[in-house]
Amino acid sequence: MTQKILNPVTGRFVKVDGSTGKKIKTGNIYDVNNILSSKLTKKIFDKIRRNDLAKEERETQQLTKKISKGIFDKIRSENKKYEKNTQKLTKKMVLDIFSKIYKEDSRKSKTQCVVSEKKDNGGVLLTEDLGKIFEKSICMLYDTPYIGPYKYGNEKPMLLKTRLTKLLDFFPELTHTAAGGALHDFTTKNSRYLSAKTSKKKDGKVAPQKIGQPTKKKFLEFFNLPPDTSNDDIKLFIKKNIVRILDEYFKYTFDDTIIYYNEVNNIIMLVKTLKKVKFDPNLIEFGCNKPGKSWKESTILFYNNKRLGEFQIHTSRSCIKFRWFFENILLLFPDNFEVTIL
């Protein structure tokens, strides 16, 4: 068998006896430079690959550092924001009456209770109905008869009763005395009084006793106004005599200690008046006096830019209503009240 050797120029095997076989195509003068041994090619490729990998690693490290810096900057920013917000919240809580509330630790109450939105007969539960249910729960706590008609069952009052046991520490005994629109909801043997107030909404609006929702006739009689006074004249009277009117509403609301239940906020608190609020007329503003506003049927009363109360004079109903934004008045005058969470 004829031996063959490798021609380094062409990269082809040729016979040892000198036979060239097929004619060799030399082509371009630079073709020889383009023919590299596999070993050299591998070296060059490995070098290129190492350089590329090193470059990629450097870029990756730079990118990682950049991303990490961005992440840590974001974390620091969020921490600063959190600290700032926390400081604001803390300051607000110190100023607010609810700093008192939180000191009482409302979480001590193990039983949470929210009264159903429906009556037993399937109708919508009104605020007045919730008030009767709440009074019934107090009657059950003190084992005293509920005075007046009651048609809402005992299941909901029993749930609320479990939240009220701490009330016994403040009023060892109570009797229900709310029949016929009486001034006091509950009375003790030594003539101490307790008023029960409820709200089904977050804003916590409550009306004063007796004069909070009177007929137009009774409103006019109470404030010694002519019986033929028009609604527009009543509105004008309210605006001109607002401090006097608020003083009367305050007396008929806060003369008694108040047991207050807000169903939406799921909170029950005992509120005792320490001193009468002195309303500054310069801080009072009627919402209807703001640009683009008017007093049609209702208007919001602001005090120091916070909602204090709401007046309602309906054209279709002969009544003059006023309701406090109850929790707001506690916030506005924290030194005037002692608040205890039950």
From Swiss-Prot:
<protein>
    <recommendedName>
        <fullName>Type II restriction enzyme CviAII</fullName>
        <ecNumber>3.1.21.4</ecNumber>
    </recommendedName>
</protein>
<keyword id="KW-0540">Nuclease</keyword>
<dbReference type="GO" id="GO:0009036">
    <property type="term" value="F:type II site-specific deoxyribonuclease activity"/>
</dbReference>
<keyword id="KW-0680">Restriction system</keyword>
<dbReference type="GO" id="GO:0009307">
    <property type="term" value="P:DNA restriction-modification system"/>
</dbReference>
<keyword id="KW-0255">Endonuclease</keyword>
<keyword id="KW-0378">Hydrolase</keyword>
